């Protein structure tokens, strides 16, 4: 597999000097590039050596392993938190020095402000010494401001890097664990949960590291401020501090409540994402069943539960945010009320020193400290979830033993095993066999007999309860449901091996892929879409087989690879691949194709997990049983009684063929051929995820807000904000006005010596109390309203997006990897639920503060507007310059994140394959490469933000300096109150202004999530589900289907997969559809179901299918699909999602498909929750559930799409018999690779390259040696061909000449007098 991206720029930070590191100058070249053009992945800098995923993950893993050992020794539960602390405490502790200096500066700064105000209170125009001292204080104040500007951002940069390292290390460990999960552990988790750990839980680490230091800095700073306030205003300061002390436990209570709500939300989010994952995976089936509405309701209910919890936690957040803004006002009110009531007189210096000191401590105590608690409690929940996952059982690591003599061997003795220990009956019992090089061991048996389990035992996936499995040699494994990952066909076959042209060509030929690859646009460099979207089932199976053959292993485990292909290709694969290419190897073949058993060295027959018989083909024949007559009799008697091969629910928790079969996203791996093969390196590319460019349009904001509330409501919110802010400023202005009046009164008294004159305290206090109350009320109302509207918007847009996804054509799902679609539902919706409302509120509040600061400063010193103009111009230019780059960086961060999830999901789907090929290390490397690519983008995102913030704070520092020195220059015209108000407000601008601008950029960045969601609400739609023209109630009554010159393609620019198809299918006719893989068989079904709109006309009972709604059309046809899909939920919901049938009808349907006993054995019977994707059923049993669905629907038209490819002949016979019996009055179309299933059809349709080549009765086609159908039948071997011809002949005469009694000899292979190979297996059971 190729590296994720090739060219990497060295990281300029490594060579940057001190100044460049402090001011982030090393980023300047990147901003220049971003200014000129859009940034691409190649512009990102390589990740620093200490930030590499491999290095970080292995380091934390070492500490975790030590912790596990220590916990075991001390007999206690291991603590992941301990491992994290031991790994990172030193590097993180050093960063506390930054906090100490920064917070210390914040505390002393107000003292110098007080000295400047004192100068104005005692202003004497002739005292030049006092003036010079005041200039000194102004200079120190300015120095403090500059120190804060620099230190703050260095601290934030380093703590965010620490958070990133912890997150990356955790992801590495989670993925490593996922590759090692035992199968019992897989039963306890789901892809959705693991994806959620990787998408949501680990993100908490990015945030928690920012605030943790404030857990000690907060209380320390509070003590220092208390001392200074005591000196300044005496005992009254305790009243204000009492309010702070009350606030703290209140906020920690809110934090606890919040954390419990978050963990509940996480569980609901898990459930929603898991279900979304299944819905997106099974979308083709959902559309064919017309089940969209049922799933829309299911997701809507899950989302409703989730959003109610989110709203709760959002209101708590809103209260926390409001308390941050209101706290200062309440504290000042309480302090100065008690100060005045104790008989003191207010002065400007006391007011503004107290205000600034409280301001400093407020930021830490009411924002950073609670954030530390909130983020800490979130992180603890996440760590607990991750720890539980890391403690799941692992598969014991098994080395591939190569014996000293170099001979491979598989030796199984008295092997018994359980998938689920809770169940009484074992999955496999008492198995014994030996396989040596050059031997082909065939394993046969009915559905649920334990065939796949036997392979998993050899793989080491099924641990023994007793007995022994000894495997010497390297294993290659081909799973029953083929696993392919996104990448080229070639990279899927090479699977990390070096490309050797000659060997590769041989493998392609042996696996019958040559012709298929020629048909693909880019040959073997065609990119396979997600879940193999560009390949048919048979092609995927052969790519899987080719991967195994190319590995050149010693032992080959093949789980029914021949079922997915037609007879001709099956014969080719068996002869050229299994018998020739692998003739020196040990091959264990699970198969239902009995014609191949002759070639097997040994045959193993399983039933209910036990070995019924073992021996060679000849030994079975010599046992002297008259196979022919037995088979015939058994078939005739099988109808009334239950066939002995009744499938029982496989007694197990999981099998790989099923567990990850229907699951989440495949990866977007950019790998082709190995290095050094330039010619092979070129490859076709999967459509890239769209990244919108430039600014977020006004339209996105408009859609976002209007989704949350009506415009009247939004205008009301804007007014509420404005009025609230006016009262906020008025409260401070009133204090300053009061201090001025008091000061003027004191001066008058001093001049006149008149002490009786005093201010009316009740008047001043009354107004002050009123203003405080209004400010508090408006602050809380504003917070809650913003959260209400924005969470509501998220809910509305989620529903619109899901509705749009349900109505999107199937092509959309073929073109977009599941990871990409899921990313919108997990990550983007997560942002809109959680971070965006918070950031938005923060932005509104800080913006209003900044505006009021500037307004106050300008009102006091009007000429301040002069330097303000150039500063504003610099700011606007800087912001625009920054956003040009930052937008691209954020979008790169989004798009480099998807492959991480996709790779995880893909690996989980192919887990057994990866482990069989010992490819864990390679997959881990690839995962680390994806992580490093994401870290490159994330690192740029962090550093570019800091680059901007440092420059913004520099602008603010200049503003503070101008105000400080300006007020001294204009001392004659100003009073102490005005200077105090202007300077204290200017100081709050520090940090506040850059935070406001950063939050505005952050809002814009997060609006990308809104934009991505809105993009999915406007997807191209398929035709409407219901139209005005409705078919008559009983339609279709006859089931006549007419194809009139039908052309079909899946996309407008795609090739035609059906060409000029014209055919008539009469009422109640049974039509078999055959053809090579990729001939257009499944496309014929797609055209019938209008999965894409066909050209030409298709009529059903004289109604043109394109004129009616899709649901009216699809509900009236039943389909048993190629890949059976079950969804999480109850069996009842899987059979009847709309509750249209009674229990009696459901049980009857289950009984007819012989699943009744199996379902009755389940703990909750029909209401038992199925495992994810129904994975506690074997593939054959899931197929039977699909048959039960068809029986319940009772439609006139039934379509069977290779439904019996994965089942044994007994179950196949059962399905065929049920179809004949239950659907005798229906029109049935059957796509089949097994010709015996359709030989008794009324007609056979032979397709080749999308054209209808032959269409007639089977016997008529078999009379023509030139016909394609005749050639297909002959390829099965003489005996099988004779048996099929005989059956076709009987059916033909029975149908056309019913009066003639037609007898035929027993089904014999006349050339040698032996019964057909088809019979062996049936009698053996």
UniProtKB/Swiss-Prot annotation:
Summarize what gene deletion causes.
Homozygous null mice are viable and fertile and exhibit any overt phenotype under normal conditions. However deficient mice show impaired anion transport in the blood-brain and blood-cerebrospinal fluid barriers and kidney. Deficient mice show an accumulation of the anticancer agent topotecan in brain and cerebrospinal fluid (CSF). In addition, penetration of PMEA, an antiviral agent, into the brain is increased in deficient mice.
GO CC terms in record: apical plasma membrane; basolateral plasma membrane; Golgi apparatus; membrane; nucleolus; plasma membrane; platelet dense granule membrane
What is the official name of this protein in its record?
ATP-binding cassette sub-family C member 4
This protein's gene is called Abcc4
Catalysed reaction(s)? Answer: ATP + H2O + xenobioticSide 1 = ADP + phosphate + xenobioticSide 2; an S-substituted glutathione(in) + ATP + H2O = an S-substituted glutathione(out) + ADP + phosphate + H(+); 17beta-estradiol 17-O-(beta-D-glucuronate)(in) + ATP + H2O = 17beta-estradiol 17-O-(beta-D-glucuronate)(out) + ADP + phosphate + H(+); dehydroepiandrosterone 3-sulfate(in) + ATP + H2O = dehydroepiandrosterone 3-sulfate(out) + ADP + phosphate + H(+)
Q: Which cofactor does it need?
A: Mg(2+)
| Enzyme Commission number | 7.6.2.-, 7.6.2.2, 7.6.2.3
The portions of this protein that span the membrane are: 93-113, 136-156, 205-225, 227-247, 322-342, 351-371, 710-730, 761-781, 849-869, 954-974, 977-997
Q: Main subcellular localization, coarse class?
A: membrane
One GO MF term: xenobiotic transmembrane transporter activity
List each copy of the ABC transporter domain by range.
410-633, 1041-1274
Which organism does this sequence originate in? Answer: Mus musculus
UniProt entry keywords in alphabetical sequence = ATP-binding, Cell membrane, Lipid transport, Membrane, Nucleotide-binding, Phosphoprotein, Translocase, Transmembrane, Transmembrane helix, Transport
List the Pfam families.
ABC_membrane (PF00664), ABC_tran (PF00005)
Question: What residue intervals hold the motif PDZ-binding?
Answer: 1322-1325
The record's function comment reads: ATP-dependent transporter of the ATP-binding cassette (ABC) family that actively extrudes physiological compounds and xenobiotics from cells. Transports a range of endogenous molecules that have a key role in cellular communication and signaling, including cyclic nucleotides such as cyclic AMP (cAMP) and cyclic GMP (cGMP), bile acids, steroid conjugates, urate, and prostaglandins. Also mediates the ATP-dependent efflux of glutathione conjugates such as leukotriene C4 (LTC4) and leukotriene B4 (LTB4).
User: Which parts of the sequence are annotated with region: Disordered?
Assistant: 657-690
UniProt PTM comment: N-glycosylated; leading to substrate-selective effects on its transport activity.
């Amino acid at each position: 597999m190729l590296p994720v991206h090739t060219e990497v720029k060295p990281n300029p930070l490594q060579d940057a000097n001190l100044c460049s590191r402090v001011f982030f100058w090393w980023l300047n070249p990147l901003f220049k590039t971003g200014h000129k053009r859009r940034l691409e992945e190649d512009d990102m800098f390589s990740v620093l050596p200490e930030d590499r995923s491999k290095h970080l993950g292995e380091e934390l893993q070492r500490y975790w392993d030590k912790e596990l050992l220590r916990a075991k020794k001390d007999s206690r539960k291991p603590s992941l938190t301990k491992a994290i602390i031991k790994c990172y405490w030193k590097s993180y502790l050093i960063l506390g020095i930054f906090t100490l200096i920064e917070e210390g500066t914040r505390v002393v700064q107000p003292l110098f402000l007080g000295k400047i105000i004192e100068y104005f209170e005692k202003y004497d125009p002739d005292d030049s010494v006092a003036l010079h001292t005041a200039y000194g204080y102004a200079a120190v104040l300015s120095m403090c401001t500059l120190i804060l500007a620099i230190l703050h951002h260095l601290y934030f940069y380093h703590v965010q890097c620490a958070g990133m390292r912890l997150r990356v290390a955790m992801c590495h460990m989670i993925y490593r664990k996922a590759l090692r999960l035992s199968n019992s552990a897989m039963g306890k988790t789901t892809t959705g949960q693991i994806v959620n750990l990787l998408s949501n839980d680990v993100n908490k680490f990015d945030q928690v590291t920012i605030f943790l230091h404030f857990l000690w800095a907060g209380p320390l700073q509070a003590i220092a401020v208390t001392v200074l306030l005591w000196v300044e205003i005496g005992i009254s300061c305790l009243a204000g501090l009492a309010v702070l002390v009350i606030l703290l436990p209140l906020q920690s209570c809110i934090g606890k409540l919040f954390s419990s709500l978050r963990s509940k939300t996480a569980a609901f989010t898990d459930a929603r994402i898991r279900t979304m994952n299944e819905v997106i995976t099974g979308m083709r089936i959902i559309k064919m069943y017309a089940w969209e509405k049922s799933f829309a309701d299911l997701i809507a209910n899950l989302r409703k539960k989730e959003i109610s919890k989110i709203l709760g936690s959002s209101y708590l957040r809103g209260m926390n945010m409001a308390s941050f803004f209101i706290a200062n006002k309440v504290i000042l009110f309480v302090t100065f009320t008690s100060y005045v009531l104790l008989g003191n007189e207010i002065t400007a210096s006391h007011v503004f020193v107290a205000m600034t000191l409280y301001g400093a401590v407020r930021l830490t105590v009411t924002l950073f400290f609670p954030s530390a608690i909130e983020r800490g409690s979130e992180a603890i929940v996440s760590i607990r979830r991750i720890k539980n996952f890391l403690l799941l059982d692992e598969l014991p690591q098994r080395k591939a033993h190569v014996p000293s003599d170099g001979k491979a061997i598989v030796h199984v003795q008295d092997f018994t095993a359980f998938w689920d220990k809770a169940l009484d009956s074992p999955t496999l019992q008492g198995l014994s066999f030996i396989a040596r090089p050059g031997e082909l061991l065939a394993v046969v048996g009915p559905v649920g007999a334990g065939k796949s389990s036997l392979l998993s035992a050899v793989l080491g996936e099924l641990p023994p309860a007793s007995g022994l499995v000894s495997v010497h040699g390297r294993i290659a494994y081909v799973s029953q449901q083929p696993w392919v990952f996104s990448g080229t066909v070639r990279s899927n076959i090479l699977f990390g091996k070096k490309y050797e042209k000659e060997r590769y060509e041989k493998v392609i030929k042996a696996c019958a892929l040559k012709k298929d690859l020629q048909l693909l646009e880019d040959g073997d460099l065609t990119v396979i879409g997600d879940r193999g979207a560009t390949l048919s089932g048979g092609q995927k199976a052969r790519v899987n087989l080719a991967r195994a053959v190319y590995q050149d292993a010693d032992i080959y485990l093949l789980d029914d690879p021949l079922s997915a292909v037609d007879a001709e290709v099956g014969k080719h694969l068996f002869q050229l691949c299994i018998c020739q290419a692998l003739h020196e190897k040990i091959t264990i073949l699970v198969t239902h194709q009995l014609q191949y058993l002759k070639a097997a060295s040994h045959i193993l027959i399983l039933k209910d997990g036990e070995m019924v018989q073992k021996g060679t083909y000849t030994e079975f024949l010599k046992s002297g049983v008259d196979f022919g007559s037995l088979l015939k009799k058994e078939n005739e008697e099988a109808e009334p009684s239950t066939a002995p091969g009744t499938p029982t629910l496989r007694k197990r928790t999981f099998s790989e063929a099923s567990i990850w079969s229907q699951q989440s996203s495949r990866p977007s791996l950019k790998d082709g051929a190995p290095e050094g093969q330039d010619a092979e390196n070129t490859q076709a590319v999967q459509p890239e995820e769209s990244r919108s460019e430039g600014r977020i349009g006004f339209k996105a904001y408009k859609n976002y807000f209007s989704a949350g509330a009506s415009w009247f409501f939004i205008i009301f919110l804007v007014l509420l904000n404005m009025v609230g802010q006016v009262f906020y400023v008025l409260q401070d202005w009133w204090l300053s006005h009061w201090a001025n009046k008091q000061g003027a009164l004191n001066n008058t008294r001093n001049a006149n010596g008149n002490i009786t004159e005093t201010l009316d305290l009740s008047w001043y206090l009354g107004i002050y109390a009123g203003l405080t109350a209004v400010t508090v009320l408006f602050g809380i109302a504003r917070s809650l309203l913003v959260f209400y509207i924005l969470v509501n918007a998220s809910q509305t847009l989620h529903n619109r997006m899901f509705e749009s996804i349900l109505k999107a054509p199937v092509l959309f799902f073929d073109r977009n990897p599941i990871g990409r679609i899921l990313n919108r539902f997990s990550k983007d919706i997560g942002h809109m639920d959680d971070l965006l409302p918070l950031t938005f509120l923060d932005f509104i509040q800080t913006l209003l503060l900044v505006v009021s600061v500037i307004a106050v400063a300008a009102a006091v010193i009007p000429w301040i507007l002069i330097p303000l103009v150039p500063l504003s111009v610099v700011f606007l230019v800087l912001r625009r310059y920054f956003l040009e780059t930052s937008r691209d960086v954020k979008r790169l961060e989004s798009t480099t994140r998807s492959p991480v999830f996709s790779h995880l999901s893909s690996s989980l789907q192919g887990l057994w394959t990866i482990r069989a090929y010992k490819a864990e290390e390679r997959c881990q490397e690839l995962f680390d490469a994806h992580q490093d690519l994401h870290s490159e983008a994330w690192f740029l995102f962090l550093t570019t933000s800091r680059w901007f913030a440092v420059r913004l704070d520099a602008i603010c520092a200049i503003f503070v300096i101008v105000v400080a020195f300006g007020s001294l220059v204009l001392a004659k015209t100003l009073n102490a109150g005005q200077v105090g108000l202007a300077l204290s407000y200017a100081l709050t601008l520090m940090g506040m202004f850059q935070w406001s601008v950063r939050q505005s950029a952050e809002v814009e960045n997060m609006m990308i999530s809104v934009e991505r969601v809105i993009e999915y609400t406007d997807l191209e739609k398929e035709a409407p589900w219901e139209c005005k023209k409705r078919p008559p109630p009983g339609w279709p009554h006859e089931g006549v289907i007419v194809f009139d010159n039908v052309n079909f393609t899946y996309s407008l620019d795609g090739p035609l997969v059906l060409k000029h198809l014209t055919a008539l299918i009469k009422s109640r006719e049974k039509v078999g559809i055959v053809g090579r893989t990729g001939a257009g068989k499944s496309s014929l079904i797609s055209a019938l179901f209008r999965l894409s709109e066909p050209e030409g006309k298709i009529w059903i009972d004289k109604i043109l299918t394109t004129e009616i709604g899709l649901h009216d059309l699809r509900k009236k046809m039943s389909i048993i699909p190629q890949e059976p899909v079950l969804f999480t939920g109850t069996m009842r919901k899987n059979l009847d999602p709309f509750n249209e049938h009674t229990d009696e009808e459901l049980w009857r349907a289950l009984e007819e498909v012989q699943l009744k006993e199996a379902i009755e054995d389940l703990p909750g019977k029909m209401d038992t929750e199925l495992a994810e994707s129904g994975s506690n059923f074997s593939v054959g049993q899931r197929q039977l559930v699909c048959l039960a669905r068809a029986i319940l629907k009772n439609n006139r038209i039934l379509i069977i799409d290779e439904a019996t490819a994965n089942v044994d002949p007994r179950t196949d016979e059962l399905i065929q018999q049920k179809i004949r019996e239950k659907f005798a009055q229906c029109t049935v179309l059957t796509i089949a690779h097994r010709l015996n299933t359709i030989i008794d059809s009324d007609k056979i349709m032979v397709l080749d390259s999308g054209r209808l080549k032959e269409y007639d009765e089977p016997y008529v086609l078999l009379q023509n040696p030139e016909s394609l159908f005749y050639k297909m039948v002959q390829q099965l071997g003489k005996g099988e061909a004779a048996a099929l011809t005989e059956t076709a002949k009987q059916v033909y005469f029975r149908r056309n000449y019913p009066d003639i009694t037609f007898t035929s000899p027993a089904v014999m292979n006349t050339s040698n007098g032996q019964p057909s190979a088809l019979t062996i297996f049936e009698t053996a059971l």
